[in-house]
Design a protein with these regions (language model features):
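Pocket-lining segment of extracytoplasmic ligand-binding domains
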Residues: 83-84, 164-256
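A structural signal for short loop-to-beta-strand junctions that line the ligand-binding cleft
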Residues: 26-28, 93-101, 126-130, 204-209
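Conserved C-terminal helix/tail region of periplasmic/extracytoplasmic solute-binding proteins
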Residues: 291-321
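Secondary-structure end/capping motifs
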Residues: 224-301
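Bilobed "Venus flytrap"/periplasmic-binding protein-like clamshell domains
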Residues: 23-47, 107-110, 115, 119-187, ...
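Alpha-to-beta junction loops
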Residues: 54, 72-81, 93-96, 125-126, ...
Length: 321
C-alpha cells in the first residue's frame, strides 16, 4: 500500500513539474525582408534573453498581405502590421489588437545633386511611391503639401510599385524622387542619396509632435488574454534584444547576414535607422495622437483606408498589465 501511495505521489510530482515547465508556443509570421527577423534572431541567440514561459515558432510569410491572411486564418498568432488595419477589423467585430514595435515609417529621397530641396520643389517632377494610392506615407505627404497650397497628386507624375522596384526607378533615373519605407530609403542614403523629409517630419508638419508607432505586433485580444504572462514576457524580451543589437557590436555582427547586403555603409545606416525607431514612450498622449492621425487619414482616403468608422476603435491598442 505504501509503495502504491509513493508511486502515485511521484507521478503527481512529475506531472506538476512537467506542467510548470511547459512553455507557451508563440507562432509568429515574419517577412524575410523585415527587421523583426533581426530582433527574433538576437532573442533566440542569447540564452539570457530566453524567458522560461514562452518559445517562438517562426513562420516565414511572403509579404504583408500573406501575413494578414495567415493571422486571420489562425495559421499564426502574431504578425507585424499597422493599427489602422487593426481598427478597421475591430469595426467589423474582430478582436485583433496592436502593441507597438517601431516608430519608423518612410522617407522622401532624392539624388544628392537634385534641385529638389522641399516638398514644393516636387511640382512637375516624377515621383516614385512605395505601395499604392492609399499608402499612409503618401496620404500624409499630400496633406502636408496641401498646407503649402500644393495639390501634390495633380502636380507630380506618379509611379507606384513595390519598395525594391521604387529604389531601382531612382537609380535608373526614371523618377526624380521616391517616397519609400525607411529601410529601403536607408539603403539609398547610404549610397549618397539625400533625404528631404521623413515620416516623423511629415507628422510634425501636420501638428503631431508625439512619436506615434507606425507598425506593431498584431494578435487576437482573446488569445493574448489567455496567454498574458507569455506575451508580455515576449514583448519585454524583444525590447531587450533590440537594445542588445543597438549597444553590442558582437550581437549586431551575428544578424548582419539578415540585412541581405555586404555593403558596410548600408549595414551601418540600417542599424542606425533600426535603433532610432525604438518605441521609448507609449502612453495616453501617443494614443491620442494616433486618434488624430486616424481622423486625418479617414478624410484623406475618403474612408477607403480606414473603413466607415468615424474614429479609432476602442481596444485597438493592447495594454501590458
Amino acid at each position: 500500500m505504501k509503495s502504491n501511495v509513493f508511486f502515485i505521489g511521484l507521478c503527481l510530482f512529475a506531472s506538476c513539474n512537467s506542467f510548470a515547465a511547459e512553455k507557451t508556443t508563440i507562432r509568429i509570421g515574419v517577412q524575410a525582408s523585415g527587421t523583426l527577423q533581426w530582433e527574433l534572431s538576437a532573442l533566440q541567440d542569447d540564452p539570457q534573453l530566453k524567458p522560461a514561459d514562452f518559445q517562438l515558432e517562426i513562420q516565414p510569410v511572403a509579404n504583408a498581405e500573406a501575413g494578414k491572411i495567415a493571422l486571420q486564418s489562425g495559421a499564426v498568432d502574431i504578425i507585424v502590421s499597422d493599427w489602422i488595419w487593426v481598427s478597421s477589423l475591430r469595426a467589423t467585430g474582430a478582436d485583433f489588437t496592436f502593441y507597438p514595435y517601431s516608430n519608423n515609417s518612410g522617407s522622401l529621397i532624392v539624388p544628392n545633386n537634385s534641385p529638389i530641396h522641399s516638398i514644393k520643389d516636387l511640382k512637375g517632377k516624377r515621383l516614385g511611391i512605395a505601395g499604392g494610392e492609399l499608402d499612409k506615407n503618401w496620404l500624409l505627404l499630400q496633406a502636408l503639401a496641401q498646407k503649402e497650397q500644393l495639390d501634390l497628386s495633380a502636380s507630380v507624375e506618379k509611379t507606384f510599385g513595390a519598395p525594391p522596384l521604387i529604389n531601382e526607378q531612382i537609380k535608373q533615373n526614371r523618377v526624380d524622387a521616391v517616397l519609400n519605407y525607411w529601410h529601403f530609403a536607408a539603403r539609398l542614403e547610404a549610397q549618397g542619396y539625400r533625404q528631404i523629409i521623413d515620416g516623423r517630419g511629415i507628422l510634425k508638419g501636420l501638428g503631431i509632435a508625439e512619436n506615434v508607432p507606425s507598425i506593431g505586433y498584431v494578435f487576437k485580444q482573446s488569445w493574448a488574454a489567455d496567454h498574458k504572462q507569455a506575451i508580455n514576457s515576449f514583448f519585454k524580451a524583444g525590447k531587450q534584444a533590440r537594445n542588445q543589437l543597438c549597444t553590442s557590436n558582437a550581437a549586431w555582427k551575428k544578424v548582419i547576414p539578415l540585412t541581405q547586403t555586404d555593403d558596410v555603409a548600408i549595414q551601418t545606416k540600417l542599424r542606425q535607422g533600426y535603433c532610432n525607431g525604438g518605441v521609448d514612450q507609449w502612453g495616453e498622449k501617443e494614443q491620442q495622437a494616433a486618434a488624430r492621425i486616424y481622423t486625418m487619414l479617414r478624410t484623406l482616403s475618403n474612408n477607403q483606408l480606414t473603413g466607415k468608422s468615424e474614429s479609432l476603435q476602442p481596444g485597438t491598442f493592447w495594454s501590458i498589465q
